[in-house]
């Protein structure tokens, strides 16, 4: 089981004060560390801050979150808890449609 947390305000630019927001995200991560003891991550993107603690199941090294994916000049971010059982088949379909992948994680298949 993983832990996900974050906050969003379209009228704020959290990237302007990353130190304060990193402190807030760190406290959130510490609170939910028992839900994902293997690794953790965070990201601050303009009006959104995301945090994740991970219990590693698939792609132990490269499946860290929050994860980003860029396509056609747009960058998307995800924090996710779950498992996509047919992600290998979905990934094959997306590869035929010229999607590219940097990991073997089921999470990257979702965000693509």
Question: PLM features: what roles do these ranges have?
Answer:
Residues 1-112:
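N-terminus-centric sequence/structural signature that marks the extreme N-terminus
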């Amino acid at each position: 089981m993983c832990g996900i947390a974050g906050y969003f305000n379209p009228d704020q630019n959290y990237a302007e004060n990353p130190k304060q927001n990193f402190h807030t995200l760190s406290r959130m991560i510490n609170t939910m560390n028992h839900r994902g003891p293997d690794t953790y991550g965070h990201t601050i993107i303009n009006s959104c801050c995301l945090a994740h603690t991970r219990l590693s199941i698939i792609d132990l090294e490269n499946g860290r979150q929050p994860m980003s994916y860029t396509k056609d000049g747009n960058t998307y971010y995800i924090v996710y808890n779950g498992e996509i059982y047919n992600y290998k088949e979905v990934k094959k379909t997306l590869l035929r449609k010229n999607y590219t992948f940097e990991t073997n994680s089921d999470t990257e298949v979702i965000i693509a």
